[in-house]
Amino acid sequence: MNLKTDRTFGVPEPGRRYRDRVGAYLVTEHAGHIALIQTPKGYFLPGGGMEPGESAETCIRREILEELGYTVRIDEVLGTADMYVRHETIGWFHPVQYYLRGELIHKVSVPIEEDHKMVWRPAIEAENLLFPECQRWAVACYIKRK
């Protein structure tokens, strides 16, 4: 995958075939707290993988509805990052992630994903809790821009 990103984490190991996964994630704040998704595997920004033909904005709208049951307003693109990692279940993995800033607007449905719980954490704590290094970077960029 040859998408130019703002920041790359890790270095691809020569001779390895990486599984690409493009996704979009939301950074949203309320009263100094950032929304995170708590799962059995750790903390993540709300969002997920893009489906074929989806834009980052469309992906965010779908994922936020599925994970949280909210509609969302997208304000801006914060940046993009990718990572080269060895994932415990996927193997050689290359996530490419778009980060958008926005606001949760209306609760319109019950979340579909039962093991995903939204929690609000102070911005610095949220940055430190996030599992993927690239998502920590996105929150750090958001904090610096404020």
What label would you give each PLM region?
Residues 29-67:
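Conserved Nudix-box catalytic region and its N-terminal flanking loop in Nudix hydrolases
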Residues 48, 62, 75, 121-124:
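Structural detector for helix-capping/boundary residues
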Residues 82-109:
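Active-site-adjacent beta-strand/loop module that shapes the phosphate/pyrophosphate-binding cleft
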Residues 1-25:
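Acidic, metal-coordinating catalytic segment for phosphate/diphosphate chemistry
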Residues 28, 99-103, 120-122:
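Short, well-ordered beta-strand micro-motif
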Residues 71-80:
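A short coil-to-beta-strand element that immediately follows conserved catalytic motifs
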Residues 110-141:
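NUDIX/MutT-family hydrolases
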